[in-house]
Amino acid sequence: MRRFFALLALVLVAAWSVRAQSPYESSADFAKYAMKLREQALLKVEPQVFVPTTSRASITRFPWKTGIVTTVFWIGEAAGGNNPVPNVKSSWDANWTSNYGGFDTPDAGSRKNYIPVSFVPRQNPFYVALPYNDVTHGQFKPEAALVIPWFKQAYTEPGRSVCKDRWLAIRKGNRTAYAQWEDCGPFRTDHFQYVFQNERPKPNLNRGAGLDVSPAVRDYLGLQPTDVTDWQFVEVRDVPPGPWRNYGDNNHFVIAKRLTEQRVVQEATDKKKKE
């Protein structure tokens, strides 16, 4: 600000010194001349300020995790091979399979439009697992409030996960899918240094996998059973239209649509009563 007033004073002094030789004879003409000099000076010193959009801000806040070994898992998956824990329940839902609506078969011949052909899922078929759980024995882990960027904003009550249902972008080549965080793994539930900080995934039975994705994510990105992807956290407002918005009682977009429909019905009912 001091720089601005000093510059303005110099401009006015320059303007007065030029007035004697200026072609502008009237005071009105001279005032216009002085203002023009001021505007030219401001253009030279005022910085160009870039105001980021909401989307750009969120991308800056949550950087991409690149080159992450990615494996496929599914709701109802039995234990076996390199999967030591069955996926009948999740870290946050003891009735995961029944709440989803059934077995989320990975068999491509038994799927259509990213969902099983045998039923309509009651939760989002685009889901993932990351190797961190913010809750243990019904309480938040000591580091949770310190390492989870959105902890304060998402907190609702003691021991209620602020990670469940969080949105991620998963990128393979020129395609990006969006999914919700619904389970913890692969293999670990304590690696916050990777999930929220800068460490790489730790070695494990699946080539150091650091991300599990559902059959829907696999199909959208064209992934192999074990592949490599990039991922990042995203805000709900930055999730674009796509098949990940279509299903699920846990899906923010489905919830918003239902609330809108309920409001329209209620408004129509209230209007009819007044007639």
PLM-predicted stretches and their roles:
Residues 1-4:
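Positively charged n-region of N-terminal signal peptides that target proteins for export
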Residues 21-275:
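Secreted/periplasmic proteins
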Residues 16-20:
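Sec/Tat signal peptide C-region and signal peptidase I cleavage site
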Residues 6-15:
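Bacterial N-terminal signal peptides
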